[in-house]
A protein has these predicted regions:
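Rossmann-like NAD(P)H-binding beta-loop-alpha module
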Residues: 1-49
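Amphipathic, soluble alpha/beta structural segments
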Residues: 11, 15, 108, 169-177
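Alpha-helix boundary/capping residues
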Residues: 14-19, 91, 146-150
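A general structural signal for well-ordered secondary-structure junctions
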Residues: 21, 98, 152-153
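Residues at or immediately flanking beta-strands
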Residues: 23, 103-105
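ATP-dependent carboxylate/phosphate-activation module, predominantly the ATP-grasp catalytic core
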Residues: 28-97, 101, 108, 120-147, ...
């Protein structure tokens, strides 16, 4: 992570030395709170399944922080769910997704709203198990219903609340030399 143009200049040669290209690409690092947002699209409209905090730690100075825990539900779920659903509905419309999963990773800064960094028509790996632990919604059954019983899938999604009664978290362990 470069915090200034002076940092970029100081690290340019060592960074360029690790590349086969004669240029570097850089992107702005968003240091806002990061979220995993699982939605389910029903008739073109996004419904929030879950919003989880992606908690991160930088293990060394100048390193991009790495995720160490995904905690369900985020304390900001009630505050962010309408904006998240609106964004996911726009994404679904853009790609033509009418029914099924759509997951979004996004950053949030107070006063700036959500900034999407990734969206995919899938569920978040093992995290569907945390949704089941926290809310009781079986994502596996929802996926099966999505294929074999669309009315049942729709009913499951419309009856679901992302404001879980139980907290659940997935931990990530990192090894460093």
């Amino acid at each position: 992570v470069a915090n200034s143009i002076d940092d970029v200049r100081a690290r340019f040669r060592s960074t360029a030395g690790q590349s086969t290209f004669d240029y570097l690409m850089a992107e702005e690092y968003n240091d806002g709170q990061e979220f995993n947002i699982m939605t389910w699209i029903v008739d073109g409209q996004a419904h929030i399944i879950s919003i989880a905090d992606r908690e991160k730690i930088a293990f060394e100075d100048g390193e991009i922080p790495q995720v160490v825990r995904c905690a369900y539900p985020s304390p900001l779920t009630a505050e962010l769910q309408d904006e998240a659903a609106s964004i996911a509905t726009k994404i679904a419309g853009y790609v033509g997704l009418e029914n099924g999963p759509l997951c979004v990773q996004a950053f949030y800064r107070e006063g700036e709203g959500l900034a999407v960094c990734e969206a995919a028509g899938r569920i978040f790996g093992y995290e569907h198990e945390l949704v089941t632990l926290g809310s009781g919604l079986s994502v596996e059954e929802l996926l099966i219903d999505c294929v074999y019983d669309q009315p049942a899938a729709k009913a499951r999604v419309l009856a679901h609340s992302p404001l879980f009664a139980t907290h659940a978290a997935g931990l990530y362990f990192h090894g460093h030399d």
